[in-house]
Amino acid sequence: MSTPESEPQAAPPDTPSTEPVRDESRARLEEALVEIKRVIAGQDEMLERVLVCLVAGGHLLIEGVPGLAKTLTIKTTAAVLGGTFRRIQFTPDLVPSDLVGTRIYRPDEGGFETDLGPVFCNFLLADEINRAPAKVQSALLEVMQEHQVTIGHDTHVVPEPFLVMATQNPIESEGTYPLPEAQVDRFMLKILVGYPERDEELTVVSRSLGDPVGVRQILPLTELAELQRAGKSIYVDPGLVSYAVSLAAATREPGEFGLGEVSDLVAYGASPRGPIALVGSARALALIHGRDYVIPADIRALVKDAFRHRLVLTYQALAEERSADDVLDAVIAAVPQPRLELGRPAAA
């Protein structure tokens, strides 16, 4: 199926050679996206990445200034999918029990009762996650990984699906607690959200002059679970798996890929969770685009989102104002993509 990637080869076309996969659940997902866009103007990449994480079963970290529809996006998504939504504003005085819950003594009943916290929902917005101390961040990230919480001697499972969308403000750094590398690694993707285009902003302002737009429930959570199962059956050519691993390896050992200029910029490269997240999210993106197989364009489209928060840059990179995206641009250009026969093999 694949040719060795040691020699640069011509890029294969990104147009699939077979008819798009069309099933009822995926068509409903498209309908759900249209319904969400009735409320959210622009921010197409953020909306698509939210759906990618939903289908892939991962969590999303968003970096952007306030006012870019992050809260409205996940709240609207919850309404369209019929799930429960909670928002937690992270502050320095927050404690873990404010998130996960606690046991409360009831004198009238002569015993303790468990009061579950706001993490027990389908869609959780952790707003400005870097404003809470490390123990609170750890409590949330443990729930993200385990999908359960232990309070006292009892274990409580969060409802499925469970999506955490955490935000960070890139402007304000005073009074913040940066996420440790081992914890930020738990997020499947990290995206950078910028200001909308002028025509999109005009639409936003025009909509604000009228009544709030209501949305319908389009895709039940049961159908979302079917989509998640379908995402796991999307075919990934072994050559693309090797390509994802090579991209990660190039962030760790850039000299081996002819990236000597990058060696002084990266202290630690992407962990093995990087290519795992990249391949998993590429599967979800292929499903959203109507294919039952991954193409190289899916991988390339998600490399930065899957890797940027997993790189630890050197002081030299910071002094030169070089970003993780600068490093990844060089990596993408240096690592040759494999030539593939597009489509799912008959035996796959």
Label the predicted regions.
Residues 65, 99, 167:
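P-loop (Walker A) phosphate-binding loop of NTP-binding proteins
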Residues 54-91:
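Walker A/P-loop
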Residues 49-52, 105-125, 154:
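Conserved alpha-helical scaffold flanking the Walker A/P-loop in AAA+ ATPase domains
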Residues 106-111, 128, 132-136, 144-234, ...:
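Canonical AAA+ ATPase core
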Residues 18-26, 39-40, 176, 190-261, ...:
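Conserved C-terminal "switch" segment of AAA+ ATPases
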